[in-house]
Regions:
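Glycine-rich FAD pyrophosphate-binding loop
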Residues: 20-52
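Helical element adjacent to the flavin cofactor pocket in flavoenzyme catalytic cores
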Residues: 209-274, 278
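Conserved N-terminal glycine-rich FAD pyrophosphate-binding loop of Rossmann-like flavoproteins
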Residues: 40-74
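Mid-domain catalytic core of redox enzymes
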Residues: 22, 258-401
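Beta1/beta-strand and adjacent pyrophosphate-binding region of the FAD-binding site
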Residues: 1-11
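Conserved Rossmann-like nucleotide-cofactor binding loop
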Residues: 11, 41, 290
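Conserved flavin/dinucleotide-binding core of flavoenzymes
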Residues: 349-498
């Protein structure tokens, strides 16, 4: 039996990894597993670049790195990823470490700026009244996330109308009027799945709090946010190496797949070289939904319709030295720097955030970098104005640290499409995985989807059958997946390394 996974992002790697592991743990004739990636590297939006800043104060070359896409994770909620990291020998302290978890909010004209810390830091601390409202919002919204009453609410509707009802303790809710415009809406515009057309206000309340719950611990256990030492690409490289050396998975880069169902199974062709083909019995499409529409030549109309519901937007990510994108007061610089948009302004409101890379990599806790005189550098997603070429960082080969990354919009249509595609998994021996198909598409969610698809494939391959199920209620499905993500009962002693 031959299984081809098309798409080498975390979603595709998760399917291949878990399928190989499932056969090792449950037995049976293991299939041939290959992962086809159109690009030259695996990992999807996990992309790291390295730079030289010349000679440092100690006379040695000063080298740094920056993640242009995926750059951190919440160890508390990433139960499955944590277990995989343990198994492959990717350990806390050496390979990933706690980041500095700080956030600033500011307007472009510098009239408003504050950090999320109540304790004053040279006059930049948030107003305690606003901080109290933020804490109240996170506590109440974290509970309401599990209440079906808000399934069709937008974020703006929740912020505006929720105070009309008492809180869980029966007391009136008195949120500061600055809560939405100066904190919640700007912060959501710093989330990768937001729509630039409609902005944060029209996003589903469930979608926003889904992310807040998993990545930032809202309504649950406190988050332990980690950065990847030497970048997220190093984690992907460690995972890929383990899969090839220990699990026998073939990873094939530079194969821009096109697939068609035939009487014998699936024929997959390299679109850049039609002479390169391979046959498979089962196909897992772990690409973005809009790419799947193009590369699967024999899609059923109902499947194509579900895929077409997923909207994508492209973001530009730049590593640079241009401090004009930060708060005017350097004392307000934080790991995450969120620009406040003027309420009601007529403009696109794309995913936008600027990281102070030194803080994200927690230089203050690293003796190698916690020294006076070292350069400060940044990563900006969708900067509000062009960054001069002279300020864009470059690697040793002269390549600019610029990346263009697609993200699906986690809107009401996406929530419905996830339920629809779940009911069509396995039809025509075709399965779907990847960020768009499971929750907000965080790596932990991609991994959980990989576990689920691997189980379906195992049942199909071993002859136990895997009948497609009726479409679940979209919000009930989202809620059940959220309960599963970060469930502490899923933690167990890591298996012995093979």
């Amino acid at each position: 039996m031959r299984v081809a996974v098309i798409g080498g992002g975390v979603g595709g790697l998760a399917v291949a990894y878990n399928l190989a592991k499932t056969f090792r743990s449950k037995g049976g004739a293991a299939p041939e597993i290959c992962v086809l990636e159109a690009g030259s590297r695996f990992g999807g939006n996990a992309e790291t670049m390295h730079f030289s800043f010349g000679t440092g104060p100690d006379g040695n070359e000063l080298r740094r790195w920056a993640d242009l896409g995926v750059n951190d994770f919440n160890k508390t909620a990433y139960v499955e990823i944590d277990k995989v990291m343990d198994e492959i020998g990717f350990v806390e302290g050496k390979d990933y470490r706690p980041l500095e978890d700080s956030t600033s909010y500011y307007t472009g004209d510098g009239a408003v700026f504050f950090t999320d810390n109540v304790a004053p830091w040279w006059g930049t601390g948030v107003d305690p009244a606003l901080k109290a409202s933020v804490d109240s919002f996170m506590a109440i919204a974290g509970r309401d996330l599990h209440d079906d009453s808000y399934r069709d609410w937008t974020l703006e509707q929740y912020v505006t109308e929720r105070p009309n009802s008492p809180g869980p303790d029966g007391k009136p809710i008195d949120w500061d009027p600055r809560l939405g415009p100066q904190v919640i809406y700007p912060r959501v515009n710093g989330m990768y799945f937001v729509s630039g057309e409609t902005g944060a206000r029209k996003m589903p309340f469930y979608a926003v709090m889904h992310y807040y719950h998993i990545q930032e611990g809202a309504g649950g256990a406190p988050a332990r946010r980690m950065y990847f030492v030497e970048g997220a690409s190093r984690w992907i490289d460690a995972l890929s190496d383990y899969m090839t050396r220990h699990l026998g998975v073939r990873l094939i880069p530079g194969f821009r797949a096109e697939a068609a169902r035939t009487a014998q199974g699936w024929r997959i062709t390299n679109a850049d070289d039609s002479a390169k083909t391979l046959d498979a019995d089962l196909v897992v499409c772990a690409t973005p939904a809009n790419a799947a529409l193009k590369l699967i030549r024999t899609l059923r109309p109902d499947v194509a319709n579900s895929l077409a519901q997923i909207r994508y937007e492209t973001a530009i990510s730049v590593a640079h030295l241009d401090s004009r994108l930060l708060p005017a007061d350097t004392n307000a610089w934080c790991t995450y720097n969120i620009r406040i948009l003027e309420p009601g302004a007529a403009a696109m409101k794309p995913y936008a955030i600027t990281y102070v890379a030194n803080r994200h990599q927690n230089d203050a806790n690293d003796p190698d970098y916690n020294r006076f005189g070292l350069p400060t550098f940044f990563v900006s997603i969708n900067p509000p104005y062009p960054i001069p070429e002279s300020m864009v960082l470059k690697d040793d080969d002269g390549r600019e640290a610029v990346a263009y990354m697609q993200h699906n919009v986690f809107d009401f249509a996406c929530i419905r499409a996830q339920a629809q595609i779940g009911a069509r998994q396995g039809v025509d021996d075709l399965y779907f995985a990847g960020g768009w198909s499971y929750g907000s598409g965080l790596h932990e969610e991609c991994w959980l989807q990989g576990i689920d698809i691997a189980e379906k494939l195992y049942s199909r391959i071993t002859g136990r059958g895997d009948q497609p199920q009726a479409a679940a209620d979209p919000h009930a499905l989202l809620a059940s997946r959220l309960r599963r993500t970060g469930d502490p009962s899923r933690r167990e002693a890591p298996p012995e390394r093979t």
